[in-house]
Amino acid sequence: MPESQQNRQTYLYMEQALQLARQTEEDVPVGAVIVHNGLVIATGVNERERNLDPAGHAEIVAMRKAAQVLKNWRLTGCQLYVTLEPCAMCAEAIIQSRVSTIVFGAYDPRSGACGSAYNLFIAGRPYPMPEVLGGIMEAECKELLKEFFRSRD
């Protein structure tokens, strides 16, 4: 796929993740999209408040759905698009599930595990590490989070 078309696809998938994030109600607005072979196979939003699930992060929700679609917990060849840098819990689940690529929007200096607060994607781990690309549509993703937290004050 030509680079310009790949870049266009990256922004389209991130826009879809952002639209999902906007649909969350009382949860922190984070949306995730999983793509396999050019097709969206799963989506997720934060569901911690709605389902009283401490592990109900958008990435985990989407990965669970993707595993069901693929009938395999190994998500090799999948790309994960998410509006906020994954936390340590999600990053480790991403590594364990063998996701091939992570694309995220806003950096999370408080708990981001793709390099902001921690970096779990380091060489020497016993699993293949995904390619990580951050800061895609960062301003839009950041603004959505700011609006959410301003409304909670």
Tell where the protein language model's regions lie, with residue ranges.
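Zinc-dependent deaminase
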Residues: 1-27, 73, 89-153
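Short beta-strand scaffold segments in enzyme catalytic cores
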Residues: 30-38
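Residues that line or immediately flank small-molecule/substrate-binding pockets and catalytic motifs
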Residues: 48, 82, 106
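Immediate flanking context of iron-sulfur cluster ligation sites
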Residues: 72-84
